[in-house]
UniProtKB/Swiss-Prot annotation:
Region (Catalytic) residue spans: 203-393
Disulfide bonds: 219-239, 305-315, 341-368
Keyword Glycoprotein: no
A GO molecular function held by the record: serine-type endopeptidase activity
Matches recorded under SUPFAM superfamilies: Carbohydrate binding domain, Trypsin-like serine proteases
Propeptide: 35-202
Name listed for the protein in its UniProt record: Streptogrisin-C
SMART domains registered for this protein in UniProt: ChtBD3
Stretches assigned to coiled coil: none
Post-translational modification: Predicted to be exported by the Tat system. The position of the signal peptide cleavage has not been experimentally proven.
Length: 457
């Protein structure tokens, strides 16, 4: 979003790590597993990858076209495998990430006896000292302290699944330690990293297109959505409050903000008038639009591309999930940290991995000349918060659970939290269904109730 208070230049510097407490691993070490068992490639068709996305991946990540296609396919498969292992490992799950040119999936656990299960699922196993749940509890305490009073000189904190730590970025060790003291967390689970980062909000319906608020500031469309018969788009909350009117990229009357939250979260949606038709597309800025097929969330290390009305199309990688970041206006929790660059006016724009919607641009530091760090608001929590349906090439992803959940389980192989690829089959209520579009199952999205996702066979 473009506005005077957000035009300060953010400083980008390296980080010097300061350990606040030693991490006790209770004698556990990483497991050097055998190569994971081969699994079938996910259904990511070559036609679904736009020339613009491939070109941006080549430019920003140093990949050739074949490597970019292979990486996206591997990352898609990794997201599905990681989701399944997170569910099956439960409290023993310690996070997942991809790394290397081939996007090799590593899944961490606190239980060495689970290494074989992880390897059999097609991932490399790593045994660590603490579960993801434990670190999420620490981060939750930090978030609560920040909501009571935003910490001074502490811009970012997150769970680093690769390091099996909570990391707090601060202008000085003293500032970081003061924040930990206020939050009352176990310092033995936290690393304070010195950082000069100063994040700020960046300020047909098609992701990445410009829109204008009340005839003044500019932001970018995230993704086309519907709510019942009402069309609209998802975007960032800091771009406008409820009742703020918008004009589209052509400067014609477009819509009105119906929901908006900022700070705390950075989510919003705009209802558009009858002159605007939602499309399952993201603007490729001269290199072909990208089709949106679903919203399966990617894992740490996966590639991700961003479309915005200031800087166009740029790519990078996902660095951390469930990050908290402090802007001048307050703290935002639950965003994803990335290496993609962005600038004011890109706010609200689309983040997408392959054909899967990931989120909308929130803010960051740096720029697209010198590089930087950005944060996006994940799309699935945004859709769920407002009861929206993502417009996709398969007809939409439902987000409204039934008002009265069933009291008895109908049985079958379908399960909440599982990532399903297009073409996968499940049983539910005595019937067999085929998945029509990739997604991660949510409560209420049962095969019998969501024909946009499942077809009975």
């Amino acid at each position: 979003m473009e506005r005077t208070t957000l035009r300060r230049r953010a400083l980008v510097a390296g980080t010097a790590t300061v350990a606040v407490g030693a991490l006790a691993l209770a004698g556990l070490t990483g497991v050097a597993s055998a190569d994971p068992a081969a699994t079938a490639a996910p259904p990511v068709s070559a036609d679904s990858l736009s020339p613009g996305m491939l070109a941006a991946l080549e430019r920003d990540l140093g990949l050739d076209e074949d490597a970019a296609r292979s990486r996206i396919a591997n990352e898609y498969r990794a997201a599905a495998v990681a989701a399944g292992l997170e569910k099956s490992l439960g409290a023993r799950y310690a996070g997942a990430r991809v790394s290397g040119a081939k996007a090799t999936l590593t899944v961490a656990t606190t239980d060495a006896s689970e290494a074989a299960r992880i390897t059999e699922a097609g991932a490399r196993a790593e045994v660590v000292g603490h579960s993801l749940d434990r670190f999420e509890g620490v981060k939750k305490s930090l978030d609560k302290a920040a909501l009571d009073k935003a910490p001074k000189n502490v811009p970012v904190w997150y769970v680093d699944v690769a390091a099996n730590r909570v990391v707090v970025n601060a202008a000085s060790p003293a500032a970081g330690q003061a924040f930990l003291k206020v939050a009352g967390v176990d310092r033995g689970l936290v690393t304070v990293a010195r950082s000069a980062e100063q994040p700020r909000a960046l300020a047909d319906i098609r992701g990445g297109d410009a829109y204008y608020m009340n005839g003044s500031g500019r932001c970018s469309v995230g993704f086309s959505v519907t709510r019942g018969t009402q069309n609209g788009f998802a975007t960032a909350g800091h771009c406008g409050r409820v009742g703020t009117t918008t004009n589209g990229v052509n400067q014609q009357a477009q819509g009105t903000f119906q929901g908006s939250t900022f700070p705390g979260r950075d989510i919003a949606w705009v209802a558009t008038n009858a002159n605007w038709t939602p499309r399952p597309l993201v603007n490729g800025y001269g290199r072909g639009d990208v089709t949106v097929a679903g919203s399966t969330a990617s894992v740490v290390g996966a590639s991700v591309c961003r479309s915005g009305s200031t800087t166009g199309w740029h790519c990078g990688t996902i660095q951390q999930l469930n990050t908290s970041v402090t802007y001048p206006e307050g703290t935002i929790s639950g965003v994803t940290r990335t290496s993609v660059c962005a600038e004011p006016g890109d706010s609200g724009g689309s983040y997408i991995s392959g054909s899967q919607a990931q989120g909308v641009t929130s803010g960051g530091s740096g720029n697209c000349s010198s590089g930087g760090t950005t944060y996006f608001q994940p799309i699935n929590p945004l859709l769920q918060a407002y009861g929206l349906t993502l417009v996709t090439s398969g007809g939409g992803t439902p987000t409204d659970p039934p008002t009265t959940p069933p009291t008895d389980s109908p049985g079958g192989t379908w399960a909440v939290g599982t990532a399903y690829a297009a073409g996968a089959t499940v049983t539910y209520g005595g019937a067999t269904y085929r998945c029509l579009q990739a997604h991660t199952a949510q409560p209420g999205w049962t095969p019998a109730d969501v024909p946009a996702l499942w077809q009975r066979v």
